[in-house]
Amino acid sequence: MDFTQPKPATALCGVVSADGKIAYPPGVKEITDKITTDEMIKRLKMVVKTFMDMDQDSEDEKQQYLPLALHLASEFFLRNPNKDVRLLVACCLADIFRIYAPEAPYTSHDKLKDIFLFITRQLKGLEDTKSPQFNRYFYLLENLAWVKSYNICFELEDCNEIFIQLFRTLFSVINNSHNKKVQMHMLDLMSSIIMEGDGVTQELLDSILINLIPAHKNLNKQSFDLAKVLLKRTVQTIEACIANFFNQVLVLGRSSVSDLSEHVFDLIQELFAIDPHLLLSVMPQLEFKLKSNDGEERLAVVRLLAKLFGSKDSDLATQNRPLWQCFLGRFNDIHVPVRLESVKFASHCLMNHPDLAKDLTEYLKVRSHDPEEAIRHDVIVTIITAAKRDLALVNDQLLGFVRERTLDKRWRVRKEAMMGLAQLYKKYCLHGEAGKEAAEKVSWIKDKLLHIYYQNSIDDKLLVEKIFAQYLVPHNLETEERMKCLYYLYASLDPNAVKALNEMWKCQNMLRSHVRELLDLHKQPTSEANCSAMFGKLMTIAKNLPDPGKAQDFVKKFNQVLGDDEKLRSQLELLISPTCSCKQADICVREIARKLANPKQPTNPFLEMVKFLLERIAPVHIDSEAISALVKLMNKSIEGTADDEEEGVSPDSAIRSGLELLKVLSFTHPTSFHSAETYESLLQCLRMEDDKVAEAAIQIFRNTGHKIETDLPQIRSTLIPILHQKAKRGTPHQAKQAVHCIHAIFSNKEVQLAQIFEPLSRSLNADVPEQLITPLVSLGHISMLAPDQFASPMKSVVANFIVKDLLMNDRSTGEKNGKLWSPDEEVSPEVLAKVQAIKLLVRWLLGMKNNQSKSANSTLRLLSAMLVSEGDLTEQKRISKSDMSRLRLAAGSAIMKLAQEPCYHEIITPEQFQLCALVINDECYQVRQIFAQKLHKALVKLLLPLEYMAIFALCAKDPVKERRAHARQCLLKNISIRREYIKQNPMATEKLLSLLPEYVVPYMIHLLAHDPDFTRSQDVDQLRDIKECLWFMLEVLMTKNENNSHAFMKKMAENIKLTRDAQSPDEAKTNEKLYTVCDVALCVINSKSALCNADSPKDPVLPMKFFTQPEKDFSNDKSYISEETRVLLLTGKPKPTGVLGTVNKPLSATGRKPYVRSAGTETGSNINASSELSPSAGNRSREQSSEASETGVSENEENPVRIISVTPVKSIDTVKNKEINSDQSTQGNISSDRGKKRIVTAAGAENIQQKPDEKADESGPPAPSKPRRGRRPKSESQGNATKNDDLSKPVSKGRKRAAGSQESLEAGNAKAPKLQDGAKKAVPAERQIDLQR
């Protein structure tokens, strides 16, 4: 730096001594520009020492050295190029300010400004603590701070420039090598300026705040700490300045006031962390910003407040409730990123402020249903993260939100929810990290996770399997620990979870068998048939992997590798071998994965897919050692030495569930059971009093004991007498399993079964029915398993005892308690024996598999008579209503069982099929429920002919929502299975008539044409009932127009009109009813589909059993329903009576007064008009109803006997032109719900028989009593199966509709399907998102 040549010293200072000389301290020579720098430094040091030793009281010295003081402030010194000179001069000047305080010796404002700027520049020397001059710099700082020298600058007009320079200098030099004294003096210096001045300018405030910005904070943490302490110290003074700054930027939008305007939110966060009082006036401004119209601005404020509210020591939420409530409102913001940020904040808030969980719960609930997948996902992450930190942080409601999301429509959300719950279960239940109370809180997780196995998605199933192997029962545990974990898990699962787990093992075992069959195909010579079989097997395997489309390619590639690599094949064979241990399986999986890995390809989707396959088929849990450990655990439970109570399971429950577990594993891992020790333990179980335990033990022997006879003769000799005893005197279930066990594991089965058959068949005594049940079960199963040996002897038993003695006689009188159903334990032994007798007849026939002796015809006539007589075969009116329900169910189920055998299906007449079908409309809820479940079970396994699927159309008449919902689920499942089967099996095209779901239409039309409630083909009310039943089926079939199926179904209905009813081809009325149903079907199809008018791809084939061949030159263009009727059917004009008139069929059942119809409507009521409305049956959640359809869980419990009466309901207004909402059916509002607004009695209420002396409905005059309808002539229906029938006696037909008391409930509550053309727009759902204004 260039300096001007200094003038003589006298001129430099302006004030000299009396003789014109500057007075220097003793020993100090004159300091001028003539001397060398070193000499100058030497002399200045002596001056510094002199001023350092002076104090304010030395008036003479002060006066003496005043010229020197002025001299040191000359330009020569202030601009000296030598830093040591400048430092010494600065020290002198600082002491001069101290000595002469409070008045400075310098009067010129410009000079003062130059001096303080000079001193400030020298303070930069504080930066280097290792400098030899550091102590002198420190002395300078200390002196300035102690004297508060800079306060002199307040008198200067532009003092702000000095202060800004000072603050910037101090913040820039502070570093981690400085001790606390340096920082303290800096703080003293700066705080005195802030607190004693008139205010802090924006530029000065910026010099402080800039150190809080993250970028600066990261560069120099010491400057951040200095600023932080400074702000804390001066909070009272500086708060107003800070408020003004934020007010300018946030409210007035004047970002130009400061270069820090763009960092306002960062500054607010830091200032809040330093001291919330700094922002007392700023927080209301943030509330204003939260309501900004700019989404990005709201997002920035939400991010800021999330940090402020969520920080650990923050009490902002309690101190500023309005701001907190305003912030919570952003959870419902219209801007997706704002909602997302709000949800992310919740995790920190839950962890740091558990007391705010209650406020957050409701908002998280809404966001857990957010339309944005990412937000739903983050809700789960938020809750799970907090729960993993401490389970006490989340309440049951929050965990419930995660539970709900396991059924989310998006895979990513479902996966996060499932994995999160699995981690919580492992942490708190398996490891018990927070004690028993926490474990109890999340004990439901295991059941919920396994329930997800019921979902259709293969991804869900695979994830459940992974969770089971890693979290519920970790496969990497030692065998004993792993089996203990499984043993007590199985004992504590709910029934649905147990079924899911069993299904999981079954699916894995099935996949193992597919892979085994694939490897067997590799061993065979190459041929076209072999290649075709291999391709089919590969497609089956691919269906069991994620993304089946891609999986097909990968499985084909894997198959090629298997074909080329024999060693890989041997590894895979070992993996699926029944003798493979868990440790071997782990080695095999790793070895196969290593061989297929490609080091050059870090992400290998092919390898990932193969790993999925290997994980599913590898026996990672169960081997011989594991079974042995399970058996030992069960033995400990039997001996009472196990930890059952500690694990929260009673010993009896542990034994029973342990044996059930072993029973399930005996299906999937039979080889692992083959040891004397295991079988000895099972023999011990056989001797236990618990019937369920013994039954399970027998079944395990049946599944696993194939080598007992040859390898373990001692076990064999002990087992045989026990099996004989169980077959003769055990429970019915034990008897069945014992017979099957003997048949499965012994070579001399004929001798063994004969030793059971002969004494049992001789000792049958109908007078002691309680001793009949087990013998009947055993005899039935023996005749089914060994028909060649026992079919003939059984014929005489059937003719002389079963039919003549047991079924055709009523020895006891049933209770007349009015109940239509009783629990199993209350059913009379005689009825139980009759039910088993019916089952025996079926098993006997199923064993023979032929009708050479015409026994099947006789049996079918007997079963038909049972249905026609409503279960009271003898018609002596001695049997109770609940017992009649049991026998109707048994008869209907028996016909359905026989229909599964082709030779018997052929001889079942249409009349008998119709009688069987009507059981699904029985008046007893449980009969309808159980029959529907049996029907579904057989159809879904493709065991029953397609015509039986038509029976589900009658479910439209069921008064209970649950039953209709179940029926619809069954239809969906059956139709999807049949379509999938046709796709997967090319050969199935030859059997399209029996497989294609659309072919159910002609069977349905024929069945409805013969509905006993369809008596008048032009009755609009009856036609509406028919339409409801048709649409119940057609709606499911018409969901998709696959292969132009709509036109195909229309063509079938049109073709039926060209035939005659094969059941009564010459009866004009019968044919007219058939053609009328066809026209109703055509009307429905035309109104629901615009695609049905296209040409059908093929001409449908009609079943010969139900329709005659079309006659030549026969045309039938006649419309059997008028245009007015057509409009009524489609527009849904309410009718005076409900669809349920069909369910509550007016039968004059035995033991009850004949049902009377009113003259005007033909749907009378026997319910008092002044009575109250009964509660409707509750509708289940989607999850429950879907599970019910899969698992057959009971949908109705027993109800106390009570008479429920209702008030007839007036017709509602016509509901027209609304769009049909297909989702209604999923919720249970199907078919007749779509057509009628139903008022349904509870399931128990409908099973209460009205007393005979109840008054008829007073709404209309009673019509004359009608005879019972529907029994066919004796020559057709009875034959030799009944004895002494009086044909003239009035009898009722086989269907008993749901109790007559419900008929008036439904009257007039119709809401028919709506026309699509004039569809009324649905009211949009209320929006959960807060539209920001």
UniProtKB/Swiss-Prot annotation:
Residues 1160-1179, 1222-1232 have a biased composition (Polar residues). Interacts with the cohesin complex. Interacts with WAPL (via FGF motifs) or CDCA5 (via the FGF motif); the interaction is direct, cohesin-dependent and competitive. Interacts with SMC3. Interacts with TP63. Residues 1133-1333 are annotated as: Disordered. Its main location: nucleus. The lineage of its organism: Eukaryota, Metazoa, Chordata, Craniata, Vertebrata. Belongs to the PDS5 family. The gene is Pds5a. The modification Phosphothreonine is found at T1207. GO terms for biological process: anterior/posterior pattern specification; cell division; DNA repair; heart morphogenesis; lens development in camera-type eye; metanephros development; mitotic sister chromatid cohesion; negative regulation of DNA replication. It comes from the Eukaryota. Pfam families: PDS5. This is Sister chromatid cohesion protein PDS5 homolog A. Residues 1317-1333 have a biased composition (Basic and acidic residues). HEAT repeats lie at residues 392-428. The modification N-acetylmethionine is found at M1. It comes from Rattus norvegicus (Rat). The modification N6-acetyllysine is found at K1145, K1210, K1289. Keywords: Acetylation, Cell cycle, Cell division, Mitosis, Nucleus, Phosphoprotein, Repeat. The modification Phosphoserine is found at S1096, S1174, S1194, S1304. Probable regulator of sister chromatid cohesion in mitosis which may stabilize cohesin complex association with chromatin. May couple sister chromatid cohesion during mitosis to DNA replication. Cohesion ensures that chromosome partitioning is accurate in both meiotic and mitotic cells and plays an important role in DNA repair. It is found in: Nucleus. One of its GO terms (cellular component) is nucleus.
